[in-house]
C-alpha cells in the first residue's frame, strides 16, 4: 500500500481482468473488484458480490478492473445491502444481459424490481441456496447505520435488510461479511 498526495492509503495499480478470468480453472479464485466487491470463480461458476463497476457517486482511488460491458457471464450477483457503495443500480442494470440471477435480502430485492426492473431473489438471514455446487448462506450483518441519524429515520431500518454471505465451494469456504 502507498499513500497518495492527499495522505490517503491507496491500493497498488489495478490488475485488469480478462476473458481468462471467467474460464473454469479447476479451483476457486477470488478477484477484488474494488471497495467491498469481489468476483468468485469456482469451477467456472461466476459470482459477483457487491459489484460497483460504474455509477458510484464519489471519486474512486482505483481504476475498476473490469467494466460491465466487458463481463462475459455471471451466474449470480449477490448484494449485501442497499448502500450505493455495495448496490450499484447502474452495474446491476448493465449486467442484466449476462447475469442469470440476483440474490439479496427481501428489501434489496424489492428495490431491484422497483428501480431496475430486475427480478431479484430475496432471502432471509440464515437462508441457504445453491448455485451449481456452491452452497450460499446469508449471514447477519449489523449495518443499520441509518438509525443513528434523524434525517434517515423516514422508515424503520431492519437488521434483516443487510447481510453477509458464507460460500461453501468444493475446495474453499469464503466469508463475505458487512459491518
Q: Residues of each region from the PLM?
A:
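Short, basic/low-complexity N-terminal boundary segments at the transition from targeting/disordered tails
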Residues: 1-22, 101-108
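Pre-active-site segment of Zn-dependent metallo-hydrolases
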Residues: 13-19, 39-82, 89-94, 145-157, ...
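Active-site-proximal loop/helix segment associated with metal-binding centers of metalloenzymes
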Residues: 14-17, 25, 135-173
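Beta-strand-turn-beta hairpins that frame and shape the catalytic cleft
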Residues: 22-28, 41-47, 128-137, 168-173
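Mature N-terminal segment immediately following signal peptide/propeptide cleavage
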Residues: 28-33, 38
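Short hydrophobic/aromatic beta-strand or adjacent loop that forms the aromatic wall/cage
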Residues: 35-37, 126, 160-164
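Active-site HxH/HxHxD metal-binding segment of metal-dependent hydrolases
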Residues: 65-129, 140-146
Amino acid at each position: 500500500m502507498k499513500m497518495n498526495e492527499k495522505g490517503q492509503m491507496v491500493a497498488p495499480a489495478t490488475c485488469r481482468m480478462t476473458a481468462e478470468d471467467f474460464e473454469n480453472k479447476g479451483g476457486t479464485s477470488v478477484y477484488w473488484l474494488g471497495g467491498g466487491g469481489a468476483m468468485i470463480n469456482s469451477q467456472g461458476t461466476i459470482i459477483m458480490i457487491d459489484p460497483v463497476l460504474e455509477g458510484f457517486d464519489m471519486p474512486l482511488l482505483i481504476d475498476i478492473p473490469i467494466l460491465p460491458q466487458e463481463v462475459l457471464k455471471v451466474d449470480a450477483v449477490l448484494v449485501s445491502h442497499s448502500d450505493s457503495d455495495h448496490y450499484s443500480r447502474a452495474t446491476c442494470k448493465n449486467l442484466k444481459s449476462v447475469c442469470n440471477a440476483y440474490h439479496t435480502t427481501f428489501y434489496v430485492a424489492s428495490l431491484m424490481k422497483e428501480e431496475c426492473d430486475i427480478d431479484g431473489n430475496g432471502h432471509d438471514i440464515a437462508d441457504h441456496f445453491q448455485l451449481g455446487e456452491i452452497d450460499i448462506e446469508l449471514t447477519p450483518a449489523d449495518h443499520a447505520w441509518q438509525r443513528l441519524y434523524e434525517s434517515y429515520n423516514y422508515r424503520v431500518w431492519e437488521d434483516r435488510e443487510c447481510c453477509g454471505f458464507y460460500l461453501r465451494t468444493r475446495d474453499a469456504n469464503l466469508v463475505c461479511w458487512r459491518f
